[in-house]
């Protein structure tokens, strides 16, 4: 995968438009989770250090396209950036006709989704974005799977289109895990339904040596192997699909599970051998023996991809399986990559972030990349690099 990288470019005196993913939660005009802003800071600082006139753009929320809405304004993000950078970051609302930014200065453009044609990737709007800059930098991996004006269209028309450090690091990490992974490779894919992760399971079954499944997905594989799952969430119409995947790759199944009679924070947890699961039991986590078995597989792996907690870890009594696997990944010498919202929450809960090789910032984009799909915003950078 060959793209131009912002870090390799001479930006002195250049007008640089950086597309970041600053779509953060805001309450009462204050940013409540700053992870995405923090992730963007090194790119912004590097562009400033290189002497560029920096313009940053992003979307926030889902406003009606072409209409301003105060609740989707990037004003709280501009305020946050001003504090984080120790300098004023003006929010510019009217920028499509041109903006006066001096080298070494920075402005934040108002929500790109206030512009008509953004979602539809209209060429006219994309050309207006491109006219604002000498260099366009795509740094928002989380939106790379969407072909929109500020992620894809502008890259077609800008004089130079490059990947920012955040996007480049993401592509390098995913390429390392999926392109030619060090073997043996283990993948953990968990979630409520096989149907929503079918492409991920099929794609990974072709490259990994051990495909560990969890959650409702594991229940479907258990049922497909003839094991009782009680009243657990599973998909009876996908049993043949589960068998077909298990025929292609080793899918180690739980030997014991943690069950309850109800799905509730106060539910009583009971460990049972898989054969002893009763008709009124719900499987809500893998059992301790299974967790130990899976942990051994992970510790002997050279590449690990993790997407999804293996139990209802939000309730502590059903969190042991996810905790044990998280710690095994942290202790492993393998190259490890993790992605997906629930996965990130589990990583936070068990404090293993520092010991995972790479944590992906993109939910949908991460999954689409794992599925083997082309990400439009990356594809256009590749085609521009070849030109």
UniProtKB/Swiss-Prot annotation:
Its main location: cytoplasm. Pathway: Carbohydrate degradation; glycolysis; pyruvate from D-glyceraldehyde 3-phosphate: step 2/5. Keywords: ATP-binding, Cytoplasm, Glycolysis, Kinase, Nucleotide-binding, Transferase. SUPFAM superfamilies: Phosphoglycerate kinase. GO terms for biological process: gluconeogenesis; glycolytic process. InterPro entries: Phosphoglycerate_kinase, Phosphoglycerate_kinase_CS, Phosphoglycerate_kinase_N, Phosphoglycerate_kinase_sf. Its EC number is 2.7.2.3. Gene3D superfamilies: Phosphoglycerate kinase, N-terminal domain. Substrate binds at residues 21-23, 36, 59-62, 113, 146. It is found in: Cytoplasm. Coiled coil: none annotated. Pfam families: PGK. It catalyses: (2R)-3-phosphoglycerate + ATP = (2R)-3-phospho-glyceroyl phosphate + ADP. One of its GO terms (molecular function) is phosphoglycerate kinase activity. ATP binds at residues 197, 314, 340-343. GO terms for cellular component: cytosol. Belongs to the phosphoglycerate kinase family. Monomer. HAMAP family: Phosphoglyc_kinase. This is Phosphoglycerate kinase. The lineage of its organism: Bacteria, Pseudomonadati, Pseudomonadota, Gammaproteobacteria, Pseudomonadales.
């Amino acid at each position: 995968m060959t793209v131009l990288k912002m870090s390799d470019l001479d930006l002195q005196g250049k007008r640089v438009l950086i597309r970041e993913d600053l779509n953060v939660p805001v309450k009462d005009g204050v940013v409540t989770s700053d992870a995405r802003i923090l992730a963007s800071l090194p790119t912004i600082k590097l562009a400033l250090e290189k002497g560029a006139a920096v313009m940053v753009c992003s979307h926030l929320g889902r406003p009606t396209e072409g209409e301003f809405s105060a609740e989707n304004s990037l004003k709280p993000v501009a305020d946050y950036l001003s504090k984080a950078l120790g300098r004023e970051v003006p929010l510019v609302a009217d920028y499509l006709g041109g903006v006066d930014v001096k080298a070494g200065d920075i402005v934040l453009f108002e929500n790109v989704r206030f512009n008509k044609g953004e979602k539809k990737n209209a060429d006219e709007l994309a050309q207006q974005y491109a006219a604002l800059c000498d260099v366009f930098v795509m740094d928002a991996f989380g939106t790379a799977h969407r072909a929109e004006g500020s992620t894809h269209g502008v890259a077609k028309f800008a004089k130079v289109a490059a990947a920012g450090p955040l996007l480049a690091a993401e592509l390098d990490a995913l390429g390392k895990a999926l392109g030619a992974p060090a073997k043996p490779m283990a993948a953990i894919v968990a979630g409520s339904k096989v149907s929503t992760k079918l492409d991920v399971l099929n794609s990974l079954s072709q490259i990994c040596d051990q495909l560990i499944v969890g959650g409702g997905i594991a229940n479907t594989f258990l049922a497909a192997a003839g094991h009782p799952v009680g009243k657990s969430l599973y998909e009876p119409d996908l049993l043949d699909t589960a068998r077909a995947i298990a025929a292609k790759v080793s899918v180690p199944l739980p030997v014991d599970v943690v069950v309850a009679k109800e799905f509730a924070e106060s539910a009583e947890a009971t460990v049972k051998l898989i054969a002893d699961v009763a008709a009124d039991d719900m499987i809500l986590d893998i059992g301790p023996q299974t967790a130990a078995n899976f942990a051994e597989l992970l510790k002997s792996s050279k590449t690990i991809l993790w997407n999804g907690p293996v139990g209802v870890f939000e309730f502590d009594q059903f969190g042991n399986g996810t905790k044990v696997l998280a710690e095994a990944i942290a202790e492993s010498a393998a190259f490890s990559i993790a992605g997906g919202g629930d996965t990130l929450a589990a990583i936070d809960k068990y404090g293993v972030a520092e010991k995972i090789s790479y944590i992906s910032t993109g939910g949908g984009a991460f999954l689409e990349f794992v599925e083997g799909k082309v990400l439009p915003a990356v594809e256009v950078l590749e085609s521009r690099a070849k030109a």
